[in-house]
Amino acid sequence: MYLKNISLRGFKSFANKSNMVFEPGISVIVGPNGSGKSNIVDAISWVLGEQSPKTLRGSSMVDVIFKSKKEELAIAEVSLTFDNKDNALPLEFNEVKFTRRVYSRGGSDYFINSSPCRLSDMIDVISEGGIGKGLYTIVSQGQINNIAILKPEERKQIIVEIIGISKHKNRRNKSKNNLEKA
């Protein structure tokens, strides 16, 4: 599984629809200061379930909607399309698209492959694939410094989370408990 495409419209500095296509492997987003690199990372975090406006560098969720002195949009929308040919996500599609919208009047909509869903449904599917806001999918510069100064055992725990071992341990423990009850 890999992120194949990001589509942004009305999100922070991206007033007009913008598409970014990625290939398998490591992708790097580069550009001069103020060109929107951090906003791309914020957009990814937002679709993956980020609920804290502060984490997205705002005071409320509507702050992600494009606003300038000349123009103010009523909606922000971001879609992340993942290649799912390896079935890492628990859906039987070769591509899975997650979309999140927020409206200036308040309220949000969420979609998986253009079908309406709840945020919790989207987060569940994303987490099953081993990605998500709490899973070190996105590591910022400040987090790298913090990880580097951790005690070895704390650092090991983070690595275990990153590679997905904790998810399997939790499933194993749940299965053990179910067997003991039976």
Label each residue range with its predicted role.
Residues 2-182:
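Gly/Lys-enriched N-terminal cap/neck module of very large, oligomeric protein machines
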